[in-house]
Amino acid sequence: MSAALTTLLLFVATAVAELVGCYLPYLWLRKGGSVWLLLPAALSLAVFVWLLTLHPAASGRVYAAYGGVYIATALLWLWWVDRVTPTRWDLLGAGCCLLGMAIIMFSPRSG
């Protein structure tokens, strides 16, 4: 598997872990879910933090680039979990963010 594809898949896994970790407390606080949802939420957020440590670039660069993938993944979440269809403007914005991620992560580096 190429380094670019590995990086992208790692970003997506990181985003899913963060989304799950934030969505479960939302279900508890806003939708009347069980307080027990906080346990898998905490585990998911711990996985999220661990996944961030697996990225092979400087942390600031990883966080900046990850934001673009998070936005695109959150829009998929909007569509699949919340059952709200993203608008073309949502998709255009996500495309711009993914382009930014690609520039940040895959541009040539000196030294």
Curated annotation (Swiss-Prot):
The chain crosses the membrane at residues 8-28, 34-54, 62-82, 91-111. Keywords: Cell inner membrane, Cell membrane, Membrane, Transmembrane, Transmembrane helix. InterPro entries: UPF0060. The keyword Nucleotidyltransferase does not apply. GO terms for cellular component: plasma membrane. PANTHER family: UPF0060 MEMBRANE PROTEIN YNFA (PTHR36116:SF1). Belongs to the UPF0060 family. This is UPF0060 membrane protein xcc-b100_1273. It comes from Xanthomonas campestris pv. campestris (strain B100).
